[in-house]
């Protein structure tokens, strides 16, 4: 058994949303920066259709009118993909990879912001199928036909699985860094490491790199820090991967 790719989509997607500064926060004088993280909520397949529901959790840091410490406001930018997908059925397996490639914030007025995000969207769908090979001729007269044989290496997809897990850790600020007051922003990058097959399972490792921007407790000035956490996880593919050719 293997998994055949029956649909593929790769395009940049641009979405925007307005957000209002809460009443408890001062007016915006100048936008300092904007950051965000893409969160996929759901993936659905129907006959000839693929739907992906996601959103960008954005953070905008700005200077308040009249001076003072920088302020932070959160914004949600919805991302909805409705794709025509010939060949896709309700039994197809959807895979979605959304990457934030750009984000910016613009002041519409001192109490309202426009946040625009650009996302690289990659959506694929797979169908369970069987591989078949022809290794010769059969039937009347087949013995009179000369057949040239050769060897080829193929790499079929034998399983498509996903797993959600949580990585948590506690960090200490590096020596010399000011004590943390309010957390202004944080961002996360995930880098995969080794991947190996053990029976029907895939064992994989990686590193979570987190960057933070915060207000110093005593001075209110902005400071930044970075931290790393390694992880190791396992996922069951329900497929025998003991062959040395599996990767």
Predicted regions: what is each one?
Residues 1-247:
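Viral structural modules
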